[in-house]
Curated annotation (Swiss-Prot):
This is Putative membrane protein insertion efficiency factor. It is a peripheral membrane protein. The keyword Cell membrane applies. Keywords: Cell inner membrane, Cell membrane, Membrane. Belongs to the UPF0161 family. Pfam families: YidD. One of its GO terms (cellular component) is plasma membrane.
Length: 79
């Protein structure tokens, strides 16, 4: 499943994205973020991070630098 999602994201980046002018408000782009998130955290958590990021990518959000987290913050216990 992870491989399929990665292939779909790469397909979007290579074939669909070039047809439109750049419009992502973030660095790295949302598709690059999604690819890194799925590679690092897998389909469920990485996909969830990607969806949340895509939902923030709109004209009313300032955007900016927003990298994929280095560690899975959902697994940290509050002390």
């Amino acid at each position: 499943m992870k491989t399929l999602l990665i292939v779909l994201i790469k397909g979007y980046r290579n074939f669909i994205s070039p047809l439109f002018p750049p419009s992502c408000r973030f660095q790295p782009t949302c598709s690059k973020y999604a690819l890194e998130a799925v590679e690092r955290f897998g389909v469920l958590h990485g996909g969830s991070l990607a969806i949340k990021r895509i939902l923030r990518c709109h004209p009313f959000h300032p955007g900016g630098y927003d990298p994929v987290p280095l560690v899975d913050s959902s697994s940290k216990r509050s002390q």
